[in-house]
């Protein structure tokens, strides 16, 4: 066994200084990194770390195993062009490849990834593409980069999992697709960059999740039916959260005063309204709490840390960045649900956060 805190290394990932591709060879584009944990051999086996670089052009996903003593490469996926991908082993030998495709993971990534089991082993949803447990390309929709995506059983009346994603390039807007095949179940179009979108179960009158984004400014059910269309009453387009005692999602929003000022929202069937804490205050009123950015309202971490199935949210103290403020609900609930960390996709999602 290695000593606690001992540094471990494994070769195989593209060097930090590597740049590539016309306008995209500068640091902001080449140095985009994501990471996650995936049970690539199935839930009964050890998990792998998946380290990722690049999503505006070339995309690399590096799966690494740890046996308690050393790191070893499981595989390295490289989508080098829009039409070609290869998978290499730890010695750099090509073990799988495909050429002349209509789309790969090249330029398809998002600002986050998602991990979930769609066929018995975990796969990585990499924006508009998905990488199989063996490093091969599972599918690519070709709809390109986006700022947000959600992977879950969004439609309980369909078998398997679904993905909701928004896209930066016009006119792609958003898409709702099968997580295993990439089949587009419905989509919306837009004339601009659709920079925000959320899938959350905010309305108990409709089965499954509801979805909304900046492009259409409509709330739709999981079948694409519009259930609310007042642009001035759209819910926040950031994070969903379990906070009060019912079984619907609440939302994390950001206000302008002061900057990066987080607060909770609740959907009432027609519009989203602020949801104060039990003391009548909002998250930003306590401990000088601020989010990591404004338009996405990103907290330091959101997870069911304490285990009663409602979620905690952590923000940093604007007056003292060494302080973290942990918020938890004190609202009673009549529902007894196992801690969310027992859910496979949820636990992996906390890891990639």
Language model: regions and residue ranges:
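Extracytoplasmic/lumenal domain signature
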Residues: 1-353
């Amino acid at each position: 066994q290695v000593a606690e805190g001992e540094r471990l290394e494994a070769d195989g990932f593209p060097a930090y200084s590597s740049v590539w591709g016309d306008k995209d060879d500068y640091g902001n584009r080449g140095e985009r990194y994501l990471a996650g944990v995936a049970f690539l051999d199935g839930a009964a086996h050890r998990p792998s770390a998946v380290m990722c670089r690049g999503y505006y052009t070339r995309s690399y996903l590096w799966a690494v195993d740890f046996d308690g003593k050393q790191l070893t490469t499981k595989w390295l996926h490289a989508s080098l062009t829009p039409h070609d991908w290869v998978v290499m082993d730890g010695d750099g030998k090509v073990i799988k490849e495909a050429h002349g495709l209509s789309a790969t993971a090249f330029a398809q990534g998002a600002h986050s990834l998602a991990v979930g089991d769609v066929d018995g082993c975990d796969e990585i949803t990499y924006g508009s593409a998905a990488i199989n447990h063996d490093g091969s390309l599972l599918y690519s929709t070709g709809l390109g980069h986006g700022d947000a995506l959600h992977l879950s059983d969004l439609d309980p009346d369909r078998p398997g999992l679904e993905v909701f994603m928004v896209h930066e390039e016009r006119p792609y807007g958003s898409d709702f697709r099968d997580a295993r095949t990439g089949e587009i179940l419905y989509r919306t179009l837009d004339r601009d960059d659709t920079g925000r979108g959320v899938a959350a179960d905010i309305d108990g009158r409709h089965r499954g999740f509801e979805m909304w984004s900046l492009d259409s400014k409509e709330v739709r059910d999981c079948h694409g039916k519009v259930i609310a269309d007042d642009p001035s009453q759209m819910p926040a387009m950031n994070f969903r959260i379990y906070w009060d005692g019912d079984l619907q999602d609440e939302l994390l929003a950001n206000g302008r005063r002061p900057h990066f000022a987080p607060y909770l929202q609740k959907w009432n069937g027609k519009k989203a309204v602020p949801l104060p804490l039990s003391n009548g205050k909002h998250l930003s009123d306590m401990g000088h709490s601020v989010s990591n950015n404004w338009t996405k309202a990103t907290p330091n971490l959101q997870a069911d840390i304490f285990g009663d199935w409602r979620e905690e949210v952590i923000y940093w103290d604007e007056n003292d960045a060494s302080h973290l403020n942990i918020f938890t609900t004190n609202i009673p609930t009549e529902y007894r649900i196992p801690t969310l960390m027992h859910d496979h996709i949820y636990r992996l999602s906390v890891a990639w956060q």
